[in-house]
Amino acid sequence: MKLLAVRRLLRIQRVVIRYRLDDLLFDLPLPWFLLALRFALPWRWFPRKPLDLSRGARLRLALQDLGPIFIKFGQILSTRRDLLPEDIADELMLLQDRVPPFDSQKSVALIEAQLGKKISDVFSRFDIEPLASASVAQVHAAKLKTGEEVVVKVIRPGLKPIIAQDLAWLFILARAAEKLSADARLLHPVDVVSDYEKTIYDELDLLREAANASQLKRNFEGSPLLYVPQVYWDWCRPKVLVMERIYGIQVTDLATLADQRTDMKMLAERGVEIFFTQVFRDSFFHADMHPGNIFVSTVQPWSPQYIAIDCGIVGSLTPEDQDYLARNLFAFFKRDYRRVAQLHIDSGWVPAETKLNEFEAAIRTVCEPIFEKPLKDISFGQVLMRLFQTARRFNMEVQPQLVLLQKTLLNIEGLGRQLYPDLDLWNTAQPFLERWMRERVSPKAVLGNIHSQIEQLPHLANMTRDLLERMSQPHAADPPAPWHKRKDDWFLRLLGTAHLGGGAVLAAGGPLHELGHWPAGIMIAVGLYLIVRR
């Protein structure tokens, strides 16, 4: 193992030298003793032919040379435009996760070991030649004994030790960067690598991907917007996934879509509707919607339907984050920057002690130039990216789900405008957001909220005692927590439920009915405020 680690280190060193990445390092504001190291590196003692490549291209080519784990890390980095300069992020977007297929006999052996059966006992046909191959898995076409056409996804054998080794080096580099550079510390490189570690290990569990696909399929069951292939659970294992084989047109194959007389405007608008439906209705969204994972069914070209595959990466938002995201977008398009700043503070995305006026001014400086464009040309993804970049300067906590959301939105926008250049994203999304916000305060939603709070009523006495005990102990030095992270919030919502119940009793002719309906109205209003306030 140590020998492998040393060989890997030498490989990394050769790539660093080949692409002059040490030049990029020494261009950073490092301490003097580290800058002096440039004279101690033997390969810098001799003249070197200059590379006619940008810094982003050099980094991209280096990651490609280092192999699939580094390629995937670069792909994830490319979505962190709140952290990276645009020229580097643009280059990393070009990274392609394409690697040669592994030996198909190994694939067969792994499938048989996972299923505990011979291939011929499960499939009437199994194509040895893979349909596709990537860094984590490869896919074979097959036909079940019961007659269904399927695809079989198989995890590459021996992948975990390779991933562990490469992650170890990424952590070493990240920790070194945090120790050596104040600028690097602001980017939290160790946190970035930790997020990647979770993502890559999640992708190794195909049962997780199968569960994600089943959930997404259930959310859009019978919908003309999106189709998700069926999972055949009887034949799914941690390293094997069997799904319905789909037939569609790649979403970027514009010529074929045009030949089928596809309604491109509707297709683009449906992409936006799918995104906002996933985020706001379901709070569960496919977070890897790049062109390779999206196809189109043109059985009805006037009503085209998207087909989504590869649900290995998904995201979700809390109800509070959904609410603040929607309100942020509305405030931004009204150019109410103070409201945007206040929402960031209220949500806990930036520290409570942030100076509102300074934060508002920073948001205005960054976002006002965006409105030089026509409204239809404004990118939601760019808006979120600019807001996150600004908030990072005010110590915004890393929000992994919001980063996934921004990446997904940028993908959807890019595809939508490729399909239909005149796509007006705000005009398409605004009615959906307005309807969602109205539904948040509808009687049905309020009653549902009340029901969930009533379930907590048995704990009301204990919660009241705990709250009074906490209030009796001074914590002046502690900054106030964001409202949606306070435990006391449950108590206040329960109090609201009690007010609603009391108001209903009075309105029905309770003990104070001789005073008229105004006490009941006040109690109901206070109850509603405590329950749905933001």
From Swiss-Prot:
List GO terms (cellular component aspect): plasma membrane
Q: What CDD domains does its record include? A: UbiB
In terms of NCBIfam families, this protein maps to: PRK04750.1, UbiB
Quick one: which pathway? Cofactor biosynthesis; ubiquinone biosynthesis [regulation]
Protein's job: Is probably a protein kinase regulator of UbiI activity which is involved in aerobic coenzyme Q (ubiquinone) biosynthesis.
Report the EC code(s) recorded for this entry. Answer: 2.7.-.-
Q: Where in the cell is it found?
A: Cell inner membrane
**What is the scientific name of the source organism?**
Pseudomonas fluorescens (strain ATCC BAA-477 / NRRL B-23932 / Pf-5)
List the membrane topology term(s): Multi-pass membrane protein
Instruction: Report what the protein is called.
Output: Probable protein kinase UbiB
HAMAP family assigned? UbiB
**Family assignment from sequence similarity:** Belongs to the ABC1 family. UbiB subfamily.
Q: Which Pfam families does the UniProt entry name for this protein?
A: ABC1 (PF03109)
Assigned keywords, A-Z? ATP-binding, Cell inner membrane, Cell membrane, Kinase, Membrane, Nucleotide-binding, Transferase, Transmembrane, Transmembrane helix, Ubiquinone biosynthesis
- Residue positions of the active site: 288
Cite the binding residues for ATP.
131-139, 153
Q: One GO biological process from the UniProt record?
A: regulation of ubiquinone biosynthetic process
Report TM segments. 23-43, 490-510, 512-532
Q: What is its main location?
A: membrane
